[in-house]
Curated annotation (Swiss-Prot):
One of its GO terms (molecular function) is ubiquitin-protein transferase activity. There is a cross-link at residues 772, 798 (Glycyl lysine isopeptide (Lys-Gly) (interchain with G-Cter in SUMO2)). Pfam families: ANAPC4 (PF12896), ANAPC4_WD40 (PF12894), WD40_APC4_C-half (PF23405). Pathway: Protein modification; protein ubiquitination. This is Anaphase-promoting complex subunit 4. The keyword Cell division applies.
Amino acid sequence: MLRFPTCFPSFRVVGEKQLPQEIIFLVWSPKRDLIALANTAGEVLLHRLASFHRVWSFPPNENTGKEVTCLAWRPDGKLLAFALADTKKIVLCDVEKPESLHSFSVEAPVSCMHWMEVTVESSVLTSFYNAEDESNLLLPKLPTLPKNYSNTSKIFSEENSDEIIKLLGDVRLNILVLGGSSGFIELYAYGMFKIARVTGIAGTCLALCLSSDLKSLSVVTEVSTNGASEVSYFQLETNLLYSFLPEVTRMARKFTHISALLQYINLSLTCMCEAWEEILMQMDSRLTKFVQEKNTTTSVQDEFMHLLLWGKASAELQTLLMNQLTVKGLKKLGQSIESSYSSIQKLVISHLQSGSESLLYHLSELKGMASWKQKYEPLGLDAAGIEEAITAVGSFILKANELLQVIDSSMKNFKAFFRWLYVAMLRMTEDHVLPELNKMTQKDITFVAEFLTEHFNEAPDLYNRKGKYFNVERVGQYLKDEDDDLVSPPNTEGNQWYDFLQNSSHLKESPLLFPYYPRKSLHFVKRRMENIIDQCLQKPADVIGKSMNQAICIPLYRDTRSEDSTRRLFKFPFLWNNKTSNLHYLLFTILEDSLYKMCILRRHTDISQSVSNGLIAIKFGSFTYATTEKVRRSIYSCLDAQFYDDETVTVVLKDTVGREGRDRLLVQLPLSLVYNSEDSAEYQFTGTYSTRLDEQCSAIPTRTMHFEKHWRLLESMKAQYVAGNGFRKVSCVLSSNLRHVRVFEMDIDDEWELDESSDEEEEASNKPVKIKEEVLSESEAENQQAGAAALAPEIVIKVEKLDPELDS
């Protein structure tokens, strides 16, 4: 006899795996069949639905961090954000490959995050979304960074790379909301630039959710006192964001452009430093053995100077030149060092200057926006602060041009030195010297002498002991990340323009001229520029943050469970924003008679509006098998629950009297039957929201649910946590040991059958449930459909008021 499965339709297992490390966080991609995991080893893993196959792994490292606390997907599913507690960093990772596209530091360790997308539509926003970014038309494309340098520059090092487009994402505003300890809450536009810092909330954030209409922010916090935790729900008004949404979107888009350009400039400087160190190390490696083996007390500089003046080299220097360096090696070394010098020069011209010019463009546009005070002054955009930032960028460009002149001068000396040394070595080997190489003017000798003076000073303390016998002081001093003045600043004596400015008090203080810092390094001026830009863009975050006022505070419950036993990252509560009906939902459990009863709190995103059935508790009564009409009655405790989609909640239950291995259930709970309009008046909360909810359990209306469909017994698994994804119609269940994962397809055709008669028979035989796949004949299928049609009208779930007899 053919029988239907335990759950109807069946939740089909599509993947199962035992993982080597404990999983502490998992979240489905909003758009694809991918699930991101974080484990106790500090790894971030990406798995595909099919057979739970691993796509990639982002291992822990010193730069990013090793203690992952939470994950969040960008709404388009192209970027994954994760927070690290040990380094207090947020990393944005590409979904295609385990590479950091962007990272930033925060003030406190992040305990939860939420990434939302704005759904509000308006004609102003639509025109902005559809308009082409003018910067793409007016600004040249940023040159790609050379691949042979730091790995951190991958985002800007691919030809025709779309990483920048991936990083900036769609023009439609999306906001990454971060929550941490001591009331730390910050909002980042496009996941990159801070646009709000919320104050006035106490405790550690357990969950948060910014509504898609930008009208309110829901936060759940925990305040620990005397070994127990007070958990409360807050709702904050965010009317400033809602009222000025077009302006916030434009401003935030500019902020992200500026943030990306600052990262580009930083990476360009990193490449320049590496090229400079390459020159140092190449020359040093050639000179180290010579210095260690020479018997004379003369310095390397003296040895070369003696050769320049008298045309004769000491035995040690001759051995170095002829045996260790060789004529061929000298040519190769010269070409290599010239290439490194050229790389620095190219990075300044192509990368620093183009990046700085783009930065000037976006800051100038931002200044124009700030001048429209009616629109942007309420958001805290300050034209004077932006003007100061523009001036700082101008100073940076001046310093970059100064470095170019120094490089050009050093290149002349360098070429003269290597040409002279090449001729000297040819003479030592008595090879023929070409007449054009033999000519050496007094100017050439001066260049060589300058090169020897500048580069062969023994400087053990320079640059963290890099370049002990050879230094590139004139170029390197610009790349030092220190506050010290330049060792050899440029000579401004005789510079007519400089003298003219110094002698003119009007021009000297003119705001039209960029200030010049002749004694400071490029790194110093760059850091100053970054600080000024950060300060001018920080003001909107302060203004918007202060505008977010606490409108509602509901104390939920007192939690005495230890942090170790409940695994902070999976613990209730769970927040959800229904974008269609503009509602905030909060799932949490209250301990009653040693059982955890699930409660659903809902609030309208608009603080001024109320909603019926604002608080309701759910009791799980009976579960009926489809054809045998066998009813499974027991006492169920809610272990975990998450929203599957706007209409359904996925729940993991524990049968408190069931046998181990058959005591966990996976249930789909439709909200349409929880909030039944016909009897909604009977399920009104009669208590007060000012008193802790767990102290007034009797006042919370309880609806008992009886299931005929949409449930499944989780055999041979101590299921504890669940993550659902209504878009892909899948759910992932995690066991209490945090290693065993089982993935279910939730909406499938009725094609699976169960060969069992009842729970009692299975338990008596002590055999596990066996599921087998069978193909129905056409006649059997017709008979089955006819039988189903003859039954009473199809009711998926029976909903009744609390009836003690049913559960006895």
